[in-house]
């Protein structure tokens, strides 16, 4: 019920809770309960780019999606496109951990790009930027033994810059 533009709360409780997900999953209508996530143009673009077999049901009177599809879309956003082709090949990256650069802030990704002079096209979005940086990140050669030796030396000699900053700030107070 609506009183002079104010809600009594009754219609709010009948929102997505009694609605079914508005998506067609590979042509079949999803029967899960709709959550509070909506199928926006941005999400639709992600679904198209990642080639997920999801589309909105034109018969649905809302754009709310279930938690299952929300999670699936979010998961697809962070995965790299070429994962399937890498799984088919005989390459094994079992010893290399997968780093999810999408979790970093855009400014951090841009600083990395600027520092390593990684070239990208202008107007690139966060997902594309993190994917480009991930490709570059994997090409950086590292000498594990040398890095570990240096790390242990720095810890034992108390030469860590962060420790020095903490000590000077403690002495000043």
Swiss-Prot record:
Keywords: DNA-binding, Metal-binding, Nucleus, Repressor, Transcription, Transcription regulation, Zinc, Zinc-finger. A zinc finger (Atypical) spans 21-69. InterPro entries: His_deAcase_SAP30/SAP30L, SAP30_C_sf, SAP30_Sin3-bd, SAP30_zn-finger. Pfam families: SAP30_Sin3_bdg (PF13867), zf-SAP30 (PF13866). It is found in: Nucleus. One of its GO terms (molecular function) is zinc ion binding. Transmembrane segments: none annotated. Component of the class 1 Sin3-histone deacetylase complex (HDAC). PANTHER family: HISTONE DEACETYLASE COMPLEX SUBUNIT SAP30L-RELATED, SAP30. Required for the function of the class 1 Sin3-histone deacetylase complex (HDAC). Belongs to the SAP30 family. This is Histone deacetylase complex subunit SAP30 homolog. It comes from Aedes aegypti.
